[in-house]
Regions:
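Conserved PLP-binding active-site segment in aminotransferase class I/II-type PLP enzymes
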Residues: 1-2
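Conserved PLP-enzyme active-site core in the AAT-like
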Residues: 8-174
């Protein structure tokens, strides 16, 4: 599908490279990331462990409970991160409502769309600002080749920072 509204796309070496580089690009020491407590295991370890060691606090909430999400977002929140369908619990949150909360606080909604083919799902139409996806299944299907994509829907300087800072410093080139 045409990526309507995309202002930039960065190809990464894996889906986890796409997620980790995106979250590190958006956050800094003293910031927090509001996310679901139900995540793909590696993503959970990244947000709840690795990023915590860099001073980025995880706020793991029930994304289907909008009041809980709203209460978790504060002045130090870097973004709301979600999986379109959580893996492995298969929960689905209200994407447009989460986008409304994020935008009311001037922070991006970042969505991992790996569980729904990004070629058939328009996350941007529901308010997603940055889409991350494991493109492995589209490249080879059997993990003989892996990849990830970061799709930017207009975050100021985000694609530029991803290319000039994150790729150069973290080496997730594809």
């Amino acid at each position: 599908r045409e990526l309507k509204g995309a202002t930039g796309v960065v190809a990464m070496s894996s889906g986890m490279a796409a997620i980790s580089n995106t979250l590190f690009c958006l956050s800094a020491t003293g910031k927090n990331i509001v996310s679901s407590r139900h995540l793909f295991g590696n993503t959970y370890a990244l947000i709840g462990g690795t990023m915590l060691r860099f001073g980025v606090k995880p706020k793991l909430v029930d994304l289907t409970n909008l009041e809980e999400v709203e209460a978790a977002v504060d002045n130090n929140t870097a973004c709301i991160f979600m999986e379109i369908i959580t893996n492995p619990q298969m929960e689905v949150a209200d994407i447009a409502a989460l986008a409304d909360i994020a935008h009311s606080k001037n922070i991006p909604l970042v969505a991992d769309t790996t569980m729904i083919p990004f070629t058939h799902f328009d996350a941007h139409a529901l308010g997603v600002d940055i889409e991350v996806v494991s493109s492995t299944k589209y490249i080879s299907g059997g993990a003989t080749s892996i990849g990830g994509l970061v799709i930017d829907y207009g975050m100021p300087n985000f694609t530029k920072r991803m290319r000039q800072e994150m790729l150069m410093n973290f080496g997730a080139y594809m």
